[in-house]
Amino acid sequence: MNPKKLIPLLLPVMLLVATPVFAQMTLSGSVQSDILVPQDDDKIGTEHSDDKVLTNTYLDLNLGSKYVDAGARFEFLKYPLPGYEPDFKGWGVPHFYVKGHYKNVELTAGDYYEQFGSGFVLRTYEERSLGIDNALRGGRIVYKPVSGVTLKALTGKQRRYWHHNDALVSGADIEVGLEQFIKALEAHDTHITLGGSWVNKHEKTNADAIFVDATHKLNLPKYVNAWDARVNVTYGGFSLLAEYAQKTQDPSFDNGYHFGKGNVAMLSTSYSQKGMSVLLQAKRSEGMSFRSRRSMSGTSSYINHLPAFTHDQTYALAAQYPYATNPNGEWAFQAEFGYSFKKGTTLGGKYGTKLKFNLSHVRGLDYDGVKDPVADGRIIGSNGYKSSFFKMGETYYQDIDVQIEKRFSRDFSLIFMYMNERYNMTVIEGHGGMIKSNILIADGKYKFSPKLTLRCELQYQFCKGDDGDWAFGLAELSWAPHWMFTVSDMWNCGETKVHYYQALVTYSLKSHRIQAGYGRTCAGFNCSGGVCRWVPATRGFTLSYNYSF
């Protein structure tokens, strides 16, 4: 084996050996292992696996001291769980770092995660459920010359599963808190933060040869620059964030290899006081897909992140049709309102009542009369399409939901939820038309004793399109402080008449948590923060173990 490849493999061992030598150092970490013993099931359309056991297993080790931190992650993904991209498969130590910090300076060498502003021009992060780890490997410095000022500079190559893309990603960021220099602002409980970012991608033009026809090749840019400017104002319970980012010409697979520039604008405001909260935000993005390799598709190699202005649903049927941010462009709006009716009032009753309202609405851009210029292949090698800033196209997604949480006694409480949803399956998945659904949910909890609690869910989805109506039921018995028993069934009472049943047993002890189960899972999208991964249907035994120290 190449000696260079041994270094990351030996780093965890070196960290463990070093612990007793340096008594002032602390060792922390975590273990996560998710296992599936798959079984074929033609009724739900499972994918056959030649492997008897599938697992995603991670071991994180971090060594900390007063001035120096170091860490590494071992990943065993040689037989991964279903639904990940082919290159996800492998094993080794792909993530390791050393970090030094002294007074107002922090220096990192190795693999690191970073975000500038809202992530419009740079966000590297790990999300294991989606198979995302787009860390940069290189160097980063964070410097705070005075109170209220933070400077960052970085460079590196981005991870793509078990390799790193060739493009060099570099950037810088500055944030200034004006209240540190204008004392009148702080005296009036006002905070104003100004921020600015710049990111550069240096990608060799011969990395991907893109031909318009048999004899004409695109002259691809070697450098792509992106910048971001933002201001965040808070006054008491009021907050306002305005942010704008722009990207130079960046022909890629995502945008159909056109040479138009990209931009995104966001305005977000919120207000909160005791018993009430309000959030209003809007975002317009156009051509802001930004990857460290232009020919990539799927979930890998993103340098930036465009958050989805949609509510993260936790109930099974409400999360049936999640929305993923459209990288080529969209208008997105979101409004949230929360209110707590006081105890002793007509609506609050003896124990109080909580009300939550959410509205999410996403529309496409108006592409000068062309429904989808990227899909129909008209714009390769051109300057892109024309799109008026305020003009909107068809509806991509919409959900309106109302949730009421009511306690009827010291031992019994209920959550009621209604959700109306529109999901443009043709735009999001490429087929299926507009899916319209209405969802009713009841979630009740009864405490038999301080240790024994029963929670039950009943859900029904009236759905026009796709597979029709769905029903869901769940019973969860918690026996504190260690045990939890769960049974559930999701039934398609529309087209397929198929049941997706599950039974789970969970045991927790201090920092250990182990869960064993058996059942079916329905095929669908797993989404987080506007990024989605398709997960095929599965059936079999599952085992999960989590431990942190």
Predicted regions and their residues:
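Bacterial N-terminal signal peptides that target proteins for export
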Residues: 1-10
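Outer-membrane beta-barrel proteins
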Residues: 81, 85-88, 158-164, 247-260
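Acidic/polar loop-and-plug regions of large Gram-negative outer-membrane beta-barrel proteins
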Residues: 204-215, 308-314
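Residues lining hydrophobic/aromatic ligand-binding pockets adjacent to catalytic sites
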Residues: 124, 131
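Exposed, low-structure sequence patches enriched in small/polar residues
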Residues: 32, 50, 54, 185-189, ...
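Beta-barrel outer-membrane channel/assembly domains of diderm bacteria
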Residues: 13, 21-114, 120-122, 136-155, ...
